[in-house]
């Protein structure tokens, strides 16, 4: 059938593609090898970042055809820690990020997208992979290898709502720690880019840090882990296969925020089918510049170490962190000069 499209993977990217296709008269079938959506997630909080583009992420979701039928809380402020300096307060005029829940809970991002897809007549086949690729297929199966990993806990708490970020290589080498609390539930995690074999040590250091620096009431803790994959290749359209989300390497290499790229790439893949457009042209225009800028940002933050962490913390605190980040996520002449060096240090081009 001409209007029959198969989608491999029921994550945010795959479900977004399914929703957009269904709204335009197509009949997408989503195949998910897990028994339900969000199975790889753990009920943890994540952030829909709101700084890498001018358009507010919630406005973008609505523009793409996604309803906000899930927990989505704007956070405008928080605390930031960096080595050898006192913690600083940051505050923004626009939301720095929107807190969302991942996993299968009724108010999760994943479950919300599932409800929207099903309401439009999308068929989701769980616990099954696609067996044939004779029809046009969108591949949204998530990351394949770990370029960074996350180790953390979810927990119940009486601590008031907050957002905390820590830059410290003793806790999260070349990465960061985040603490998010909303209405009695919290997520605390260390995102690590180096020395994966010592993850347990860094997680222990994380718990010790919060015991010493910022008391957090933690009850009913549940541990979780995850990983992210980043690469940039020349094409993400192979014969009848279109790759989106982390299957295409679409991930912010600086800090691992991939949800914006997931939904945007799902939308672009759907529109390439609906309007018979070149998918590679679309993602290279809308996504690739941000990917390359994030690669340069990753190179710079690793190069400058503790000095870089303190510089970022001070910049976030002395002005509007969203505006500062937005400027630094945009391509520039200087970053175009640094890009070849960043490429040579990170062998992430051309991976399949």
Indicate where each model-derived feature is located:
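Active-site-proximal substrate-binding core of FAD-dependent oxidoreductases
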Residues: 232-233, 255, 271-311
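Short FAD-binding loop at a beta-strand-to-alpha-helix junction that anchors the flavin cofactor
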Residues: 237-254
């Amino acid at each position: 059938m001409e209007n029959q499209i198969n989608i491999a993977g029921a994550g945010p990217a795959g479900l977004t593609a399914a929703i957009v296709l269904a709204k335009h008269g197509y009949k997408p079938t989503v195949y998910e090898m897990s028994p339900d959506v969000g199975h790889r997630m753990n009920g943890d909080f994540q952030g829909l970042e709101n700084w890498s583009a001018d358009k507010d992420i919630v406005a973008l979701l609505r523009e793409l055809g996604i309803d906000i039928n899930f927990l989505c809380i704007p956070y405008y402020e928080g605390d930031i820690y960096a080595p050898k300096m006192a913690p600083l307060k940051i505050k923004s005029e626009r939301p720095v990020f929107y807190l969302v829940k991942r996993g299968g809970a009724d108010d999760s991002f994943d479950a919300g997208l599932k409800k929207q897809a099903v309401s439009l007549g999308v068929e989701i086949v769980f616990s099954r992979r696609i067996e044939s690729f004779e029809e046009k297929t969108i591949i949204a199966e998530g990351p394949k290898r770990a370029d960074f990993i996350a180790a953390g806990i979810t927990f119940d708490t009486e601590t008031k709502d907050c957002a905390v970020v820590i830059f410290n290589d003793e806790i999260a080498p070349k990465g960061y720690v985040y603490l998010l609390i909303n209405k009695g539930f919290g997520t605390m995690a260390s995102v690590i880019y180096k020395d994966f074999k010592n993850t347990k040590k860094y997680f222990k250091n994380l718990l010790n840090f919060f015991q010493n620096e910022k008391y957090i009431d933690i009850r009913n803790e549940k541990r979780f882990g995850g990983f992210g994959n980043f690469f940039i290749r020349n094409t993400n359209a192979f014969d009848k296969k279109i790759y989106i989300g982390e299957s295409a390497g679409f991930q912010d290499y600086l800090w691992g925020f991939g949800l914006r790229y997931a939904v945007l790439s799902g939308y672009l893949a759907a529109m390439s089918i609906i309007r018979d457009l070149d998918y590679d042209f679309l993602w290279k225009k809308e996504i690739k510049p941000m990917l390359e800028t994030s690669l340069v940002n990753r190179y710079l933050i690793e190069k400058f170490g503790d000095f870089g962490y303190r510089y970022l913390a001070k910049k976030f605190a002395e002005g509007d962190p969203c505006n500062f980040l937005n400027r630094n996520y945009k391509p520039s002449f200087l970053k175009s000069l640094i890009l070849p060096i960043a490429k040579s240090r990170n062998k992430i081009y051309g991976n399949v």
